[in-house]
Amino acid sequence: MSAIPEEFLSTQAQVDEQAIQPFPNSRKIHVAGSRPDIRVPMREITLSDTHTSQGREKNPPLTVYDTSGPYTDPEAKIDIRQGLSELRRNWIEERADTEILSDLSSQYGRQRNADSKLDSLRFAHLRPPRRAKAGHNVSQMHYARQGIITPEMEFIAIRENQRLEQYREQLAQHHPGQSFGAHLPSRLTPEFVRSEVARGRAIIPANINHTELEPMIIGRNFLVKINANIGNSAVTSSIAEEVDKMTWAIRWGADTVMDLSTGKNIHETREWIVRNSPVPIGTVPIYQALEKVGGKAEELTWEIFRDTLIEQAEQGVDYFTIHAGVRLAYVPLTAKRLTGIVSRGGSIMAKWCLAHHTESFLYTHFEEICEIMKAYDVSFSLGDGLRPGSLADANDAAQFAELETLGELTEIAWKHDVQTMIEGPGHVPMHLIKENMDKQLACCGEAPFYTLGPLTTDIAPGYDHITSGIGAAMIGWYGTAMLCYVTPKEHLGLPNKNDVKEGIITYKIAAHAADLAKGHPSAQIRDNAMSKARFEFRWEDQFNIGLDPDQAREYHDETLPKDSAKVAHFCSMCGPQFCSMKISQDVREYAKQKGLKHHTALEQGMAEKAQEFREKGAEIYHET
């Protein structure tokens, strides 16, 4: 899509071809729910047969969680100028608690729509916004607390289970894990989803104006999720590039995407992204509000911010990062820090508080913000504006003072049945990570934790996807529900598509490692399938089971490029004579032939190999 000039965007925009290619040996499947319009997408990987001395053994296909939406479905017709189909429209309409507005409620939104100079880059098929009817609350938390299981909740239960019942045999070898108090049922039910949302331990980010959304859940007792950040700046990127980044991010496994645009045409960029996104979209509304006052934080007002919230809610943004915990009294606590306030949103609000010498309007108007959130079912992501920006500042008084305030604000949000998660650090050495998780659980009533890493060392610019991936795996194990990815460009510049992919793969590894360590019931299925394929030298299956089949195949072919190497019973690491797995297979075959038990065969086989070694001259190395 990025090759299209913006003046022709509305008529000529095309989807990124790389983003819509099906994964090798994979197909999109849909698991049916209790009603015809609940069809949960998953990816099924076809596996090759196992070859044994007794013949062939079938390996069942492997089902994996899929965030790519219809983009990787060859049967789907993708036209980003039209947007995705409205999966949730009927579910929302049948609840009969919303109304379609005759016009946008936001003054800024109306101004943008009336500006004919924007016609060429505006998404052409704008829909009138939807809002809760007077006196109604349309949040998934509100429904859950009424005892209602919504179609979204059933969709999520099916999605999280990943057809687990079909893989019980593959889980014969399964580590129970250490969950640190999380409750991970052996099978998720819609009722369990409802109860977790009602309790506030999980959120379903699903704005009523984002009808294209495939429902997902963020919570400690579910699969660990990851978020990918995209967004333009004043110096780089276009609408087309940001849509490409979104489709690219969800291909590789982003569960949500945050649009952090601060450049031109923020409103139009967001519309294109939301209309074409099957995953929840988050934003930091204060960024756009700041642009509306020319970048001068002290000129921000509650009225401008309120209008921005409504503008974005009516476009379909699913969760807002709001830095309402940055209070005037906490700003001096950052004075002796090595790196001060590093959160963009936090620094904006700190500057406003100091300029006006009063509490932040985000804090004083918090209940009014809740009224807006529940009218559209936008979830809170309560921002950590005072997070540490260096190891030296980790776990200090400013960070934890804000966290305690976020806990108080969570209780207020829950009083309004508004879904809420809490953002966390940041830069934290490994031995201080668990304290962050424990304190968040205690302060915030087990609301989902959403962390940026944390980075475990500050010495590796260019490799902060690794320094943070270490911390992400740890804090995910301890109970964090969603991990915000870090790319190799962190602290250095805006990421491109390759950086986005590398950050996502790194964080998919971290999230999956956390699921394994927690003992999530379905997590080890994929690992066991990979291990079996590896032991049986099913190279194509190894590539395809992996998170990045393209790179796995490329690395293999660098040293063994011929097709024959993809059926060889060795790799380039050890070669044909020293492959440990090949030796183990030989021992098993020897045991079958001799009618021996495995350990007896091993002893006898080793004796025969020793005799063979001596007869060949007892030389360690031979010419080949």
Swiss-Prot record:
For the biological process aspect of GO, one term held by this record is: thiamine diphosphate biosynthetic process
Which reactions does this protein catalyse? 5-amino-1-(5-phospho-beta-D-ribosyl)imidazole + S-adenosyl-L-methionine = 4-amino-2-methyl-5-(phosphooxymethyl)pyrimidine + CO + 5'-deoxyadenosine + formate + L-methionine + 3 H(+)
Q: Which domain of life is it from?
A: Bacteria
Protein name as catalogued: Phosphomethylpyrimidine synthase
Tell me the cofactor note. Answer: Binds 1 [4Fe-4S] cluster per subunit. The cluster is coordinated with 3 cysteines and an exchangeable S-adenosyl-L-methionine.
**EC?**
4.1.99.17
Please report the organism this UniProt entry assigns to the protein. Nitrosococcus oceani (strain ATCC 19707 / BCRC 17464 / JCM 30415 / NCIMB 11848 / C-107)
Q: Which residues bind substrate?
A: 229, 258, 287, 323, 343-345, 384-387, 423, 450
Alphabetized Pfam families for the sequence? ThiC-associated, ThiC_Rad_SAM
**So what family is this one in?**
Belongs to the ThiC family.
UniProt: [4Fe-4S] cluster binding residues: 571, 574, 579
**GO-annotated molecular function:** 4 iron, 4 sulfur cluster binding; carbon-carbon lyase activity; zinc ion binding
Q: How does it assemble?
A: Homodimer.
Q: What does this protein do?
A: Catalyzes the synthesis of the hydroxymethylpyrimidine phosphate (HMP-P) moiety of thiamine from aminoimidazole ribotide (AIR) in a radical S-adenosyl-L-methionine (SAM)-dependent reaction.
Keyword terms: 4Fe-4S, Iron, Iron-sulfur, Lyase, Metal-binding, S-adenosyl-L-methionine, Thiamine biosynthesis, Zinc
**Spans annotated as Disordered:** 48-70
Its needed co-factors are: [4Fe-4S] cluster
